[in-house]
Design a protein with these regions (language model features):
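N-terminal, post-signal-peptide segments of secreted/periplasmic proteins
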Residues: 23-153, 158-160, 299, 323-460, ...
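Cleavable N-terminal signal peptides
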Residues: 10-11, 21
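Parallel beta-helix/beta-solenoid
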Residues: 79-80, 136-137, 142, 158-160, ...
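Edge beta-strands of extracellular beta-sandwich domains
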Residues: 474-486
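Short glycine/acidic-rich loop motifs that flank beta-strands on beta-rich extracellular proteins
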Residues: 151-156, 173-180, 206-215, 231-243, ...
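Bacterial N-terminal signal peptides that target proteins for export
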Residues: 1-9
Length: 486
């Protein structure tokens, strides 16, 4: 008997050391915003009182739907590895709301001041008036909630290894629905503080930006979310903005009705794949080096993929297997992005679309933002111009396509003695100059004069064919002019 007791005691100690000890659970079954037992504020305080221990906050459905906890002042920041779960979602798909409208007052975006005095709303630096705050903390889960009427729905500031899943994020007009930022408190990025977070299967509606990955946010996964803006949104800016964020994966999301579905500002090596972007002014609005855009569906926008000029003349962006159709719509929506320049080129892939850092940008740069005109950027039109940015994406030129006897000839004019990849796309209309279907690829190697010719025969019945050219480091051209097969 004594030996059994010793073995059980040893097992209990081992379980405790290995983290098998039962996590504390706090039940929220009162929607009053106070510190009495059963309130959300009380539950967060209890979890925070044990900052090294994992726990759960289970928010129950109380009364009849819709279920809402209206908070009267900022909630405590999350300081412990806790799971905060609205329990009704797993039962019926209904969300339990956490609502900030009782204490965030004002007219629209004016209720949300930025970090710089006189600035407010979306597209200014801000961490102001968030709903749920994860700062300098790891291992938090948020599920089954509707988070609404804050300036930022969820702020993840220098926070890693957290999960935001199966929530509805709505009407957070100031900063973003969810903001992942490495901001050090002074606007500087931190490289290793906001990593390996997952934002999965959420619905974002009518936030300023839907989601932001900024100031060093890296190696995060944003997947299978729906980002949508409606007429109720005072600043339909970006579905996702990546600002100085690197090595993130954005996969399988949908973006509708923004100035830009997704905008990258000088982020590097982000992988953006299998997303759908429709009814935006720009589907993608891009700068940065080493970003890859793979197998996205881009349709019904003014510009499908816009690539801006930037100060880094070596920056390159890779476009591969993207399906692009029915763009060129008259969608002039330009909140810190979009394409509203009169008479500009529109369509599938367009270089030198101006952003808010460019002198010829037309639109809002953010409320209260003042930029010295001398600091605004311009794009060089000739190779000998000074004081301007080089043409985007290495100024790589699309191949020239011709058709003869059912075969397509692609002529490449580029750098000498280099490997290039030509991707071919098809369209259902003979008059289309886009990329509705991906048909295949071929390799071309240029000679000492920088030219190459290859022949390729389509195996799929299409009415017209276009192509892009990608160099050995990953810079991709605009689409070629189409050849008609019918």
């Amino acid at each position: 008997m004594k030996s059994i007791y010793v073995r059980l005691s040893t097992l209990a100690i081992a379980m405790a050391v290995s983290g098998w000890a039962a996590a504390e659970t706090y039940i929220v079954d009162r929607y009053q915003d106070d510190t009495d037992k059963g309130a959300l504020r009380w539950a967060i305080q209890q979890a925070n009182s044990k900052p090294t221990e994992a726990s759960e906050i289970l928010i129950q459905a109380v009364g009849k739907a819709p279920y809402a906890i209206k908070v009267n002042s900022p909630l405590p920041e999350i300081k412990a590895p806790v799971k905060i779960i609205g329990t009704q979602w797993a039962k019926t798909g209904e969300f339990i709301a956490v609502d900030g409208s009782n204490y965030i007052k004002g007219t629209g975006v004016e209720a949300c001041p930025g970090a710089v005095e006189g600035q407010f709303g979306t597209n200014v630096r801000t961490t102001t008036l968030p709903g749920i705050v994860l700062r300098d903390i790891n291992g938090v889960t948020i599920q089954g909630l509707e988070i609404r009427h804050f300036c930022i729905g969820i702020l993840m500031n220098r926070a890693s290894n957290n999960l935001i899943q199966n929530n509805r994020i709505m009407h957070n007009y100031g900063g973003a629905g969810v903001m992942l930022t490495g901001d050090d408190g002074k606007g500087n990025p931190t490289a290793t503080t906001t990593n390996n977070n997952k934002v999965l299967n959420n619905y974002f509606q009518d936030n300023g930006d839907g989601l932001e990955l900024t100031r060093g946010a890296a190696f995060n996964l944003v997947a299978n979310n729906h980002f949508i803006s409606t007429a109720a949104n005072p600043e339909p800016s970006q579905g996702i903005e990546i600002l100085w964020g690197n090595d993130n994966a954005v996969v399988g999301n949908k973006f509708e009705n923004y100035s830009d579905g997704l905008q990258i500002n000088w982020g590097k090596r982000n992988y953006i794949a299998y997303n759908e972007l429709t009814n935006n002014s720009n589907g993608f609005n891009l700068t940065g080096d080493g970003n890859i855009f793979d197998s996205n569906k881009v349709h019904g926008n003014r510009v499908g993929i816009a690539i801006r000029s930037e100060k880094d003349a070596n920056a390159h962006i890779t476009l591969t297997k993207n399906l692009i159709w029915n763009n060129g719509k008259d969608i002039k929506r330009c909140e810190a992005g979009g394409s509203c320049v009169p008479n500009q080129r529109v369509g599938a892939i367009i270089f030198d679309i101006p952003g808010l850092e460019h002198a010829h940008f037309v639109g809002s740069r953010g409320h209260g933002v003042k930029i010295d005109p001398a600091n605004l950027q311009k794009t060089c039109n000739t190779s000998d111009e000074q004081g301007c940015n080089a043409q985007p994406n290495q100024n790589i030129q699309a191949p020239k396509l011709t058709l003869s006897k059912g075969q397509i000839t692609a002529e490449v004019k580029a750098q000498p003695n280099q490997r290039y990849q030509v991707e071919f796309f098809g369209n259902t209309s003979a008059n289309s100059n886009e990329a509705e279907f991906y048909l295949g690829s071929a390799v071309a190697a240029t000679n000492a004069q920088g030219t190459a010719t290859l022949t390729w025969k389509p195996t799929t019945q299409v009415a017209s064919v276009t192509a892009t050219l990608t160099d050995r480091v990953g810079a991709t051209s605009e689409l070629s002019s189409a050849v008609k097969l019918k």
